[in-house]
Amino acid sequence: MTNLKTGWRNLWRNKSFSFINITGLAIGIAAAMLLFIVVRYELSYDTFQKNYNNIYRVVTSDRFEDGVTYNAGIPVPALEALRVKFPQATFGSLHGAYGSQVTVPMPGGNDKKIIEKVGIFFADPGFFSIFNFHWLSGSPEALAQPGAVVLSKETAEKYFGKGVSPVGKLLKLDNQLSLKVSGIIDNLPVNTDYPVKVAVSMETVKRNPDLYNYNDDWGNTSSTHQIYALLPAGQLPGAVNKQLIAFAEEHYKKRKGNGLGKTNFLQPLPDIHFDTRFETFGDHRTGKTTLWTLSLIGVFILLMACINFINLSTAQSITRSKEMGIRKVLGSNRRKLFWQIMGETGLLVAVAVILALIIARLSVPFVKHIVSMQEEIHLFSVTNILLLALIGLAVTFLAGIYPSLSMSGFNPITALKNKVMSAKVGGISLRRGLVVLQFAISQMLIIGTIVAVSQMDFIRNADLGFNKDAVLMLNISIDSSSMSKQYAFGKDLKKIPGVENISFTSDPPASDNNWSTNFAFDHRPDEKFQVHLKFADTGYLNTFGLQLAAGRNYEPSDTTRAGLINEAMLHMLGMQDPADAVGKTLRLGGGNWNLITGVVKDFKASSLRSEVKPMFIVPYKPVYERVGLKLHSANLAKTQAEVEKVYNAHFPEYAYTASFLDESINEFYKQDSQLALLYKIFAGLAVFIACLGLYGLVSFMAVQKTKEVGIRKVLGASVSSIVYMFSKEFTVLIVISFFIAFPAAWYFMTAWLNDFHYRIQLSAGFFIGALLISLGIAWLSVAYKAIAAAVSNPVKALRTE
């Protein structure tokens, strides 16, 4: 208790040092805590599943001359074949229905129409045997019958209201499938890649295969249809993977194709959320590289806060040297002094932890928004309290051990004469080293910020090869009734003054569509690479501003099926002149031959992480699920309202949904933009904490050099020369830190940029800019204390012992 009172008095007596110490630690602890919570949340995905470590997804890889493609899906008939091949395992399938509309019949005919962007699946009972769901009503066997649907509790309440039993009630899916509610499952946690809201029996889609890309053929592999396996405890996945190679050879060898080697393998459930090679049914994925980056930033920020504390504490120890000497003369031994100083450190850390909790609580909404985190963050949960206690103990030890050992080891005679500064208090070289480490970390973060922001700017301003501005994308149904209305709908859209062009299509030029197939060119055998597909009407080029390199667009008057290839396709076929491809023919899979009427200039069909793939654009009305509208930039809101009015007139049974193309493209880089923003925030925090560390070292130097400054002033030294004396040393330290930060930052940012096929080039400007920023901020930090020392009364300085 005595040590606690003494610690509190010292804390209150040295308000300036205490404020800086507590502030730096609080910011460091809060930042580290929030980052660790985010990382832990991402790592927790689907860990609530009972058989988490024994569940696998059966995925597909296909090797071609131009590389390997990965697909989260597997052919539909593989399910029964796998059950025969591996009777010891449990298999189940899940088929996604993205962006479907659920219609809930209401009294009076005013039906409720709800668009579910994610969460609608077709599932078989086997899936619910693998993944554990809490059934509030019904059982997995309910999904063995066609027309059966299971709802989550939250979804049932949204559709039918609270307190109403939904079992036995009717729904309609996309105005095509009549369904009866046969079961209710409890709500799943948000940290899952299987956000089941509506589960329709797989038997239902089997009877309506054309509606949801359900192709019961060994030649069709789609990430929409996925198969999962539950292996018995003790069963090694490696042995199963070896058998899957033989399984693939048996079932794929008869398929006519162009692959060099197609196979299946098991992907563990713990890897699914992080493996960016494959699609998931969740609304976002996080690569492990991102998690490692966030973890390192958290550790670095916390480490810098500890370094800052050490610097300030040792700087303060000079002013407390006489106190330590008196305590030793009065009988205190080194052990007692050590624990007193550690106690003071613990008190500071405790206050900092309380302040950190306040900062973290205020920052939670902002952090959740940045990282798109849906789960509620309970800062006072048992796990977080334990995490905070662990951080507090670690910080107390790391930040307190050196000052405690140093100050408790003062020679009492030297301390009473106030000559400790001559002994350098444990060596100023250590504190210089700590400042170098601080600024090396902060400069790494500054470089990372500059590079990430520059890459994001490059992406925003990159020439995509098509027009993405003021392009509105509508969703439309492809049922027979809606398809019959397409012509009249398009005609009315063109009458709207704000609409320049329209196109019915499967998807816009840039999308997450990965449709591809084997093909043959000019009556040759199948090529050894795949062609990617887009289906669109004749308005596609004008609506999206695509340019022809040769030939002409296909027209409705063409007597044979026709399409366009891109320049990447041209070059992979061994041609350089676009005109050479015009008039040639191309066959998709085992279908009919298509006339190539033109070559379109390359455009970026996906994220800039990927190179331009060989492309074939061809009309095919049954898959026109989107309508692209090029709008005049003036009066966009008015035009959108008129478009919605026309849509509702033609499709009253469907809810109107639309989005702008540029917003959809931005979603490709959502995680990268989040990372760039986090870099900005934590680079700023790192610089701030580093400047506090500088302030500590300058404070130490100002005390140590008090008499030297006085002598220099008496001998005629100017204020600027004294400021230069202080700044020179720190300039050298920062330059040294730059040469540590430079290679590390270059390595990490090169690795990050290598994920982008189209990227900026690292130049000296990024690194020199970071150095100049660090120097500028450091000089400002040093200047305050240096000027104060330079303008002090030299007479008082010369009296200093």
Placement of each model-derived feature along the sequence:
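Mid-to-C-terminal secondary-structure elements
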Residues: 123-136, 149-286, 488-671
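Membrane-helix entry/capping segments
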Residues: 1-4, 9, 13, 49, ...
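Interfacial "coupling" helices/loops that link adjacent transmembrane helices in transporter permeases
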Residues: 14, 305-346, 693-731, 788, ...
